[in-house]
Amino acid sequence: YHMKSTDELINDLKKQDQTSFLENETDYVQSGGAYLSKLLKEHHLQPGNLIRDLELERSYAYQILRGTRKPTRILLLRIGFYLQLSLSEFQRMLSICQRAILYPRNRFDAAIIYALEHNMSIDDLNDLLEEIGEPPLR
């Protein structure tokens, strides 16, 4: 299975009429759950690793991975740190999961971007968040 690039998808969309768009709409949209499952696979992790290491409620985690529940933005940020994603990977994950991307003019988000760019651990990030009066990632 060949995953089309964004440019290929845009070119396809330009050429399609409404009927063919409606028939093929699922080719363009990836669910948050499917994307998170793919990220776990790419990092050679099982859902059980994520559940244990992030101390998630088992059924909630599986509902997220199946796409029947949307993860909170905080949970996505925790998952991103757990998987050691880059800033661009974080933004993509947040966008696909329909959550606000990190915005540098927001103090909380700026601290997260800083932590990412300086390879800080989640514990160090939580200390930094506490120092600036923001809630920790828990």
Residues covered by each model-derived region:
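The alpha-helix within a helix-turn-helix
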Residues: 40, 51, 80
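Recognition helix of helix-turn-helix/homeodomain-like DNA-binding domains
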Residues: 55-71, 96-98
